[in-house]
Amino acid sequence: MPKRKVTFQGVGDEEDEDEIIVPKKKLVDPVAGSGGPGSRFKGKHSLDSDEEEDDDDGGSSKYDILASEDVEGQEAATLPSEGGVRITPFNLQEEMEEGHFDADGNYFLNRDAQIRDSWLDNIDWVKIRERPPGQRQASDSEEEDSLGQTSMSAQALLEGLLELLLPRETVAGALRRLGARGGGKGRKGPGQPSSPQRLDRLSGLADQMVARGNLGVYQETRERLAMRLKGLGCQTLGPHNPTPPPSLDMFAEELAEEELETPTPTQRGEAESRGDGLVDVMWEYKWENTGDAELYGPFTSAQMQTWVSEGYFPDGVYCRKLDPPGGQFYNSKRIDFDLYT
């Protein structure tokens, strides 16, 4: 603390000087609590108030704080509420609980009251190093490969799904069937995996289909998946045909467009016998519901659904299945061709 030398007249020479210690203002740690003098509102002048008090290092962390009792005009707490309306007294009690004011009236929140993230506190930032340039982060597919889940081709995924689905059954229905108690009504056959294994395999195949962008795979039926497999040019569900189909000769004479679009009876039979019990339903239609109206077809269910979706039949047409012959005609607006694909 600074010391001041005071000389009393008639007591002695300058050598007989007494040292009188004058106390400074009390320094209060802002973290220790609220209270203490030094306010600009009720502060009393000391003997050395006109002198500089920066005798310390100049970087001290202690400073004068404002006590709540140093603020004039505060009200004491009365009733908490009246008539359902909350009454808040005019005082700094809540502010003092969460922080403090300095002598200049600036408000500071307590450090302990600040919200902390436990997850960030548990991170050891020393161990985290900057990733070297050129090193890319492993993707989700690579992480799955490291866990033993190898990526499969689209053909392998569809073939695996067809092995686990029943006719007219969706992927979601198969998951419910395999996940039920007992894994379905059918018993486990010789060499057939158990229901939990089939459930895990079906779930993994469906997840890979979703990862490839097919978000509606859980609502697709076995027949729809078989049509998609046929679209890939694969015929793995039926018996293997060693003789390849005849191809068109580029030097041959031009064929009529009707011959290319209209399937022959042989092609029709191959389409029906292709697959494990899968039958491609063929349709024929006419524009008017009269006996002498011209018939068009046959066409596949997928082709009919495409025309309906694109609005080629705004008023609807009268169509019927090709098999059995001589069936009744129905309006296309009442038929959902997706059920037959």
Curated annotation (Swiss-Prot):
The modification Phosphoserine is found at S46, S49, S118, S194, S195. SMART domains: GYF. There is a cross-link at K26 (Glycyl lysine isopeptide (Lys-Gly) (interchain with G-Cter in SUMO2)). The modification N6-acetyllysine is found at K44. Its main location: cytoplasm. Residues 49-58 have a biased composition (Acidic residues). InterPro entries: CD2BP2/Lin1, GYF, GYF-like_dom_sf. One of its GO terms (molecular function) is ribonucleoprotein complex binding. This is CD2 antigen cytoplasmic tail-binding protein 2. The keyword Mitochondrion does not apply. Disulfide bonds: none annotated. Residues 280-338 form the GYF domain. Keywords: Acetylation, Cytoplasm, Isopeptide bond, mRNA processing, mRNA splicing, Nucleus, Phosphoprotein, Ubl conjugation. Residues 1-66, 131-151, 178-199 are annotated as: Disordered. It is found in: Cytoplasm; Nucleus. GO terms for cellular component: cytoplasm; cytosol; fibrillar center; nuclear speck; nucleoplasm; nucleus; U5 snRNP. Involved in pre-mRNA splicing as component of the U5 snRNP complex that is involved in spliceosome assembly. One of its GO terms (biological process) is spliceosomal tri-snRNP complex assembly. Component of the U5 snRNP complex composed of the U5 snRNA and at least PRPF6, PRPF8, SNRNP200, EFTUD2, SNRNP40, DDX23, TXNL4A and CD2BP2. Interacts directly with TXNL4A and PRPF6. Interacts (via GYF domain) with CD2 (via Pro-rich sequence in the cytoplasmic domain). Interacts with PQBP1. It holds the Pfam family GYF.
